[in-house]
């Protein structure tokens, strides 16, 4: 059984990759109008979604008629195509992914750029440091970009879509291994649609999110196995999943571990036996071993006692993190489905493995949210608002099962002929509901899609064909840096507040976007204090001396903006949690006189001023 499922998972990965790759390439060959100026892409997305949902329905009919191999292949193809058309078609006229290269996507693109430039595990920004944020998704995408010769910023979109599509196909395989094939189709389609609508902006989170419902069901079955020898394949599989989660997204790993701990404790208490806790320990060992693939370098550096800050990654409390989220009370079609799922969980939690697992997972989200609010007393949070997409996917999946069971319960009250009509009517309602929700996904994502068209990409162009931003000067800035320094990009440290420059080119940065994204080993606050101190200097000698005395590799390139009174400015950020917004922006003004020296070459590029410290004063540093 386990070997067969593993083989099906390999096939799913290959099919999803092929479907996504071919579809993305085909869409890219056409000259489309921009999504934010035309409805054509939305219209074609709707047509594609309708075709994919019809294909899934046909796969279910083939299964009932005994054409099971063809049904499995068709289902994998159509669920993959559904994921691709929903994301790739609205983005068909841009090279950027959802939310472009703005805010969070800025540092994600920077991370992918770093791991495209090198196969080694390096921090996205700081030279000589191991990565603090999980590198798994970025490393895989970086290797693909390097192998194909594609710029990392341009690979971000196709890799996001392909990896999400692979996860969707794997979810179908897992569901089909545990429940009836037709039910697996419904559950996967529902959870996929919810994930695409509410989690796809963060692709590596979306991957883990769509796989959580079947994995939690698998875990619940494994932890509740009645015999000592039973359920171990499930335990090993869950351990591998948690290990992959550790490589992709720390928060979802911790939430999943929290949920599994609740499950194990519930079973151990109910049966008055320690076996579920031992199985949980096995899961922890397996996942921990896998996690070390990317976490080991950072942990070793921390154990060596290298200077580090406490980190501020959890210093964020938006409105969504200060209240509990109840999607079942939304007055929408999706809200009604979540309400149906909630009712199903309450009614069936004690009698259904699926309902029991999903109920514990939902309760765990709310428990995590309350704990997050309490941890504000300790000066931090648990970022519970980031679990809202997870909660939505869990309730949507439960709603799909609730719809199926409600339909069957009603049908069983009537004679066979009437019963078939009830099922047919419910199928029609479900299909219409699926199309209705699916065609609204681009509208849910519209703000993120629009940014993908209005941001300036790595070629210096905007996809909506309007005048590009200041980023259009990045190419000539990059050429100037290479000309003056004479070393590869990964041997140069750049100080800039225009962080998207580091998203497009693999230079190291002297300071990160904010402390929330910064490696704790980088000592963000001390670097900020050093930069602020340079504002008091008035001569090149003092400035060069200050650079050479830094405990870190000093910047040799300064990408700044013109300020008033012969100054060059940098716009930096400081953490002001628990205030909201949690970041305070401020300007540091450097006297232009500190760069007025033969040791620096200064040039203007549009709104930018570029100051480069000429080689000769410092030994070369190998960024790898």
Curated annotation (Swiss-Prot):
One of its GO terms (biological process) is cell wall macromolecule biosynthetic process. Keywords: Cell membrane, Membrane, Transferase, Transmembrane, Transmembrane helix. Its main location: membrane. One of its GO terms (cellular component) is plasma membrane. Pathway: Cell wall biogenesis; cell wall polysaccharide biosynthesis. It catalyses: Adds an alpha-D-arabinofuranosyl group from trans,octacis-decaprenylphospho-beta-D-arabinofuranose at the 5-O-position of the eighth, tenth and twelfth galactofuranose unit of the galactofuranan chain of [beta-D-galactofuranosyl-(1->5)-beta-D-galactofuranosyl-(1->6)]14-beta-D-galactofuranosyl-(1->5)-beta-D-galactofuranosyl-(1->4)-alpha-L-rhamnopyranosyl-(1->3)-N-acetyl-alpha-D-glucosaminyl-diphospho-trans,octacis-decaprenol. InterPro entries: ArabinofuranosylTrfase_AftA_C, ArabinofuranosylTrfase_AftA_N. Its EC number is 2.4.2.46. GO terms for molecular function: glycosyltransferase activity; transferase activity. Disruption phenotype: Allelic exchange at the chromosomal MSMEG_6386 locus of M.smegmatis can only be achieved in the presence of a rescue plasmid carrying a functional copy of MSMEG_6386 or Rv3792, strongly suggesting that this gene is essential. It comes from the Bacteria. It is a multi-pass membrane protein. The chain crosses the membrane at residues 5-25, 43-63, 73-93, 127-147, 159-179, 181-201, 203-223, 234-254, 280-300, 326-346, 355-375, 391-411, 422-442. The keyword Cell membrane applies. Belongs to the glycosyltransferase 85 family. Involved in the biosynthesis of the arabinogalactan (AG) region of the mycolylarabinogalactan-peptidoglycan (mAGP) complex, an essential component of the mycobacterial cell wall. It is not able to add an Araf residue to a terminal Galf. This is Galactan 5-O-arabinofuranosyltransferase. It comes from Mycolicibacterium smegmatis (strain ATCC 700084 / mc(2)155).
